[in-house]
Regions:
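WD40-repeat beta-propellers
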Residues: 22-26, 46, 62-67, 87, ...
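Conserved strand-to-loop turn within each blade of WD40 beta-propeller repeats
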Residues: 16-19, 56-59, 92, 98-102, ...
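Loop/turn segments within WD40 beta-propeller blades
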Residues: 5-10, 16, 45-52, 87-94, ...
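WD40/WD-repeat beta-propeller blade N-cap
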Residues: 1, 36-43, 77-84, 120-126, ...
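WD40/WD-repeat beta-propeller blade-loop signature
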Residues: 9, 32, 42, 49-52, ...
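WD40 beta-propeller blade-start loop/N-cap
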Residues: 5, 28, 35-38, 48, ...
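A conserved positional marker within WD40/Gbeta-like beta-propeller blades
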Residues: 12, 21, 40, 61-63, ...
Length: 264
């Protein structure tokens, strides 16, 4: 198993394998529904846009798959010169961002087989990708150890609008749903989690605790808690963001992550 991604609504989960296969499972019934072919090497990235499942592989290809149809794939995208290591859909605008080990970031419009934009600003692999939920066409990407930057792109105009040197490998990026802030996880040399204020990119807080690079990042549905996973074989939960303005507090009893208190 080399990648996992939940469908936005429902109980289906997609799994990429080291043999180039993409499997769809019903998590509720723990039953495999289908296996899709096409790739010839490991599938390291997956992204959903409703019923469209997109997969990226070490074979440098990207496939769009309509999981409702019997066909193995719907579109094949050729653009990256090395492994595709990051994929992220902007479901509202129908744009797909892809990052590769070739240091390239590409933006594809809907199901087009030709990239809308090609960005060559990074100097290391681009695995970390995130679309802003607050501003149309605002895309953040993070570079690897030889780059260390988070770069912000305007995909309406095809321009770079901002960047910050984080000082270490950028492994993941996620925007806060509740405020105009962004959280990033890092590898060598500090293995930290950082919350930034956008657009000033001033650090709100830097969190340490992991002893190896922080490879995984996920956010709770309410946008308040993030969980990180690292090569030190630990999961850590961080209550980093406040509630959405106007949202009511959950009135359930104890045991919630929010009971642990925010970190700022």
């Amino acid at each position: 198993m080399t990648s996992v991604s939940w469908i936005q609504k429902g109980t289906h989960i997609a799994i990429g394998t080291g043999k180039g296969l993409v499997q769809i499972w019903d998590a509720e019934r723990t039953r495999r529904l289908r296996t899709m072919t096409g790739h010839t090497a490991r599938v390291g990235s997956l992204a959903w846009n409703t019923h469209i499942l997109t997969s990226g592989s070490r074979d440098r290809l990207i496939y769009h798959r309509d999981v409702r149809a019997p066909d193995q794939w719907l579109r094949k995208l050729v653009g990256h010169k090395q492994e595709v290591c990051g994929l992220k859909w902007n479901c509202e605008d129908g744009q797909l961002a892809s990052g590769g080990n070739d240091n390239k970031l590409m933006v594809w419009d809907k199901l087009s087989e030709t990239p809308l934009w090609k960005f060559s600003d990074h100097t290391a692999a681009v695995k970390a990708i995130a679309w802003s939920p607050h501003q149309r066409g605002l895309l953040a990407s993070g570079g690897g150890t030889a780059d260390r930057r988070i770069i912000f792109h305007d995909t309406v105009r095809g321009a770079v609008i901002n960047e910050v040197d984080t000082g270490s490998q950028v492994c993941n990026i996620a925007w806060s749903k509740n405020s105009n802030e962004i959280v990033s996880t890092h590898g060598y040399s500090q293995n930290q989690i950082v919350v930034w204020k956008y657009p000033s990119m001033t650090q709100v807080v830097s969190l340490t605790g992991h002893t190896y690079r922080v490879l995984y990042l996920a956010m709770s549905p309410d946008g308040r808690v993030v969980v990180t996973g690292a090569g030190d074989e630990t999961l850590r939960f961080w209550n980093v963001f406040g509630k959405r303005p106007g949202a009511r507090e959950d009135s359930d009893g104890g045991g919630r992550l929010s009971d642990w208190g925010v970190i700022r």
